[in-house]
């Protein structure tokens, strides 16, 4: 199959390219970034993987819609309007979008949702994420997805408390969200469900960024067989169970 990578010279794009080159499943591997292009409009690709920048979204969607190419989106930091654009495009092409391509991390999303559904309001919930000192956004997209998964399990949205300073007693029902930045931490996320008798701690730690690249290639293989619609890594997990 022929693969096109948007953001091919970025950290994730280059990892995906290197892994794909070692997998005989991929026959042609093309790349697009801000400095070079394989002229995707003049070539036919079987799937596109996007790890570029939110500013490139319209170009990516236009290409995939015109050429009817399935799309995997790993880019984060989209505006609400851009998320709506993705949803609209998924009516014409299959799109898999995920804030984290690690299968293990997506298992964590499922586990925190199930835990929240059982415990309801019986625990204080705190989410902690740690990343390298070059990461620009906080909290991470994965931390946001953890909170969304928790709220889905609870059946309602909660107040989000981003860090604490000074006198700020914990409000009942709020979800604390905390970000740590330092060194070369690849990615660490934990969800804590705490009450007076016990703490349930659900943790995922990525040891190497290749785990995200492999997940992206797994997602690419999955999305090529799907009908138009908006998918997540949870759909891929369901297929594996």
From Swiss-Prot:
Compartments it resides in: Cytoplasm
CDD domains reported in the protein's UniProt record: DHDPR_N
Name assigned to this protein: 4-hydroxy-tetrahydrodipicolinate reductase
Residues of the active site: 131 (proton donor/acceptor), 135 (proton donor)
Top-level division of the source organism's lineage: Bacteria
General function of this protein: Catalyzes the conversion of 4-hydroxy-tetrahydrodipicolinate (HTPA) to tetrahydrodipicolinate.
Listed Gene3D superfamilies: Dihydrodipicolinate Reductase, domain 2 (3.30.360.10), NAD(P)-binding Rossmann-like Domain (3.40.50.720)
């Amino acid at each position: 199959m022929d693969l096109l990578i948007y953001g091919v010279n970025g950290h994730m794009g280059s990892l995906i390219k290197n892994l794909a080159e070692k997998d005989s499943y991929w026959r042609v591997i093309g790349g697009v970034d801000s400095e070079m292009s394989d002229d995707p409009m003049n070539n036919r690709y079987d799937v596109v993987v996007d790890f570029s920048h939110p500013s490139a979204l319209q170009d990516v969607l236009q290409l995939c819609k015109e050429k009817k190419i399935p799309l995997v989106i790993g880019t984060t930091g989209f505006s609400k309007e851009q998320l709506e654009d993705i949803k609209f495009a998924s009516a014409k092409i299959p799109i898999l979008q995920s804030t984290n391509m690690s299968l293990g991390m997506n298992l964590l999303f499922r586990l925190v949702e199930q835990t929240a559904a059982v415990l309801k309001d019986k625990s204080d919930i705190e989410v902690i994420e740690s990343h390298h000192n070059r990461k620009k956004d906080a909290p991470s997209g994965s931390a946001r997805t953890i909170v969304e998964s928790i709220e889905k399990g609870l059946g309602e949205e909660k107040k989000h408390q981003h860090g604490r300073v000074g006198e700020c007693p914990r409000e009942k029902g709020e979800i604390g969200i905390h970000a740590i930045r330092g060194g070369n931490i690849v990615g660490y996320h934990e969800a804590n469900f705490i009450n007076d008798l016990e703490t349930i701690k659900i943790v995922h730690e990525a040891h190497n960024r290749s785990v995200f690249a492999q997940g992206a290639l797994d997602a690419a293989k999955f999305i090529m067989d799907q009908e138009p619609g908006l998918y997540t890594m949870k759909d891929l997990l369901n297929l594996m169970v």
